[in-house]
């Protein structure tokens, strides 16, 4: 079944480039940039990938991202991910990147963007993988900081297809960012946002009504609100669900408890994605395979999930 799932044409719509930084590349970049790491070796770092919640993961994620310093680093990060896409027949990807993770530590916005954009261009030309880049604001920072990031992005408007919202969800509702999303949409950006991962269904309502998003990233807690579920079904609002991430971060205690197939059978346009694959134990095919192994996902369901991902593309 794994090989069949791997060969299925699919799109990935929820992937953080910084979260695809495999330990081997992390150590290589640290050596290239002469950065001392707190882990003795690759296996010690892998051993640290045991998280009880989103925040524990984010603490390690930001620490790991510190090795990314130059255009070449960001190119190598993105290119390594695109090679994974090619190997798993991901024919289209819409990755996120978090400029604030880098600008806050003194890396120029253009350095980050140039490296990523060149790799995506090469991915189109050499690997045949189409793509669109999503600029994501960090919700644990202020809206003023997000506004500054949007200012930095506007001279490169054509490099992005959308703006998003990620990082620590609890205590940082979508309403906190209404003004910057209003402004981004007025500049022609499509909006997406993480909502309903650890946060309550109310956060999904806010993301839809205040941020006017076209796609919900995660959204698994929507199932707790019947009226919200009906709206998502009626309006066919896509959900970019990340099963391995959800179990690794204890949103669900075990994959057998995941609700993605329940949502699929109710008519929700759910998709399968890897989120931060270097940290969560798998890329897109591994996520599909986990659904087959633990939830008995059928070939028909897998085809529908893959088709949903292709239908839910922004570009």
From Swiss-Prot:
Gene Ontology cellular component terms for the protein in this record: cytosol
Keywords: Hydrolase, Metal-binding, Nucleotide metabolism, Zinc
The keyword Metal-binding is annotated on this UniProt entry: yes
Binding positions for substrate per the UniProt entry: 276
Pfam families: A_deaminase
Cofactor(s) required for function per UniProt: Zn(2+)
Gene3D superfamilies: Metal-dependent hydrolases (3.20.20.140)
Cofactor note: Binds 1 zinc ion per subunit.
Active site (catalytic residues): 197 (proton donor)
InterPro entries xrefs: A_deaminase_dom, ADE, Ado/ade_deaminase, Metal_Hydrolase
GO MF entry, a single one: zinc ion binding
Swiss-Prot/TrEMBL catalytic activity: adenine + H2O + H(+) = hypoxanthine + NH4(+)
Annotated positions for site Important for catalytic activity: 218
EC numbers for this chain: 3.5.4.2
GO biological process entries: adenine catabolic process; hypoxanthine salvage; nucleotide metabolic process
Sites where the protein binds Zn(2+): 14, 16, 194, 275
Keyword Glycoprotein (UniProt): no
Name of the top EC class for this enzyme: hydrolase
Family in the record: Belongs to the metallo-dependent hydrolases superfamily. Adenosine and AMP deaminases family. Adenine deaminase type 2 subfamily.
Function of the protein: Catalyzes the hydrolytic deamination of adenine to hypoxanthine. Plays an important role in the purine salvage pathway and in nitrogen catabolism.
HAMAP family: Adenine_deaminase
Protein name: Adenine deaminase
Organism name: Pseudomonas putida (strain ATCC 47054 / DSM 6125 / CFBP 8728 / NCIMB 11950 / KT2440)
Source species taxonomy: Bacteria, Pseudomonadati, Pseudomonadota, Gammaproteobacteria, Pseudomonadales
